[in-house]
Amino acid sequence: MGSFSIWHWLIVLVIIMMVFGTKKLRNIGSDLGSAVKGFKDGMREGQEDKPAGSQQPQQTAGQPPRELHDATTIDVEARDKSKQG
């Protein structure tokens, strides 16, 4: 009574196919597959970008820390907003 038989699962599958249709289910499956493939490719690229023997450059005691500027970094400053009126 507690477990579902194969017939229960087949009936559920038929109802899902009638509600969503086979085309919609196919689109969902292909979207899910391409998302998983994109995730795996991204993880693979991330591992290739980071060589195994690379380490962070260490600073010497007499030098101030260097600032790294990237073309995509935007330097901003926060201001307090006070109520006027």
From Swiss-Prot:
Belongs to the TatA/E family. One of its GO terms (biological process) is protein transport by the Tat complex. Residues 39-85 are annotated as: Disordered. It holds the Pfam family TatA_B_E. InterPro entries: TatA/B/E (IPR003369), TatA/E (IPR006312). It comes from Ralstonia pickettii (strain 12J). NCBIfam families: PRK02958.1, tatAE. The keyword Flavoprotein does not apply. HAMAP family: TatA_E. This is Sec-independent protein translocase protein TatA. The keyword Ribosomal protein does not apply. Its main location: membrane. Keywords: Cell inner membrane, Cell membrane, Membrane, Protein transport, Translocation, Transmembrane, Transmembrane helix, Transport. Part of the twin-arginine translocation (Tat) system that transports large folded proteins containing a characteristic twin-arginine motif in their signal peptide across membranes. TatA could form the protein-conducting channel of the Tat system. Residues 53-62 have a biased composition (Polar residues). It comes from the Bacteria. Residues 39-51, 66-85 have a biased composition (Basic and acidic residues). The chain crosses the membrane at residues 1-21. The Tat system comprises two distinct complexes: a TatABC complex, containing multiple copies of TatA, TatB and TatC subunits, and a separate TatA complex, containing only TatA subunits. Substrates initially bind to the TatABC complex, which probably triggers association of the separate TatA complex to form the active translocon. GO terms for molecular function: protein transmembrane transporter activity. It is found in: Cell inner membrane. It is a single-pass membrane protein.
